[in-house]
Amino acid sequence: MTNADNELEPRLITETGLDQRLADIIEPVLVGMGFRLIRVRMLNQNGMTMQVMAERNDGTMTVQDCEEVSMAISPVLDVEDPIDKEYHLEVSSPGIDRPMVRKSDFVRWQGHLVKCETSIMIGNRKRFRGKIVEADADGFTLERDQIAYGEEPKVSIPFTALSDAKLILTDDLIRDALRADKLAKAQAANQNEADEQE
């Protein structure tokens, strides 16, 4: 999947209510800057806080990127004025134990632990935890790490049933996330050098 494909890939898990209105305002700005929206939430902490999670199409997000995104979406939010109270704007990367919101997230993080919830019962459960062993266009398969008596060790979860999913922090995940970040930074540096030579 190319960065252009990633840019256009829809999110499986989206917001509702006010959070959806905020996402509708913010997402076009992010896409225009080469970023993807992961999640937006209004939280009641330290007064009202609007939490925006985003990343570049290659999966990276620096502190400088967070500043740029904040500076770009702040004036748009001021004009649209979707919130009638004072709030703090917090822009961040999704982090290592990130929310899984696109099909490509399940492909990218195959082999890692995830916990998820479904909107329907699958094998008498709605909550699952396990290693992603396979992902395709329709869903993903988990190898459970906590099996109840009588349950199959693997469970297939269709993307249409997914209501929430998040990576679980492990040493392997930290190692692979750092490796992916290092590779993305090296590729960006090489691209910058090539652009300067032209």
UniProtKB/Swiss-Prot annotation:
Pfam families: DUF150_C, RimP_N. It is found in: Cytoplasm. Keywords: Cytoplasm, Ribosome biogenesis. Its main location: cytoplasm. GO terms for cellular component: cytosol. Coiled coil: none annotated. InterPro entries: Ribosome_maturation_RimP, RimP_C, RimP_C_sf, RimP_N, RimP_N_sf. One of its GO terms (biological process) is ribosomal small subunit assembly. Required for maturation of 30S ribosomal subunits. Belongs to the RimP family. NCBIfam families: PRK00092.2-5. This is Ribosome maturation factor RimP. It comes from Rhizobium etli (strain CIAT 652). The lineage of its organism: Bacteria, Pseudomonadati, Pseudomonadota, Alphaproteobacteria, Hyphomicrobiales.
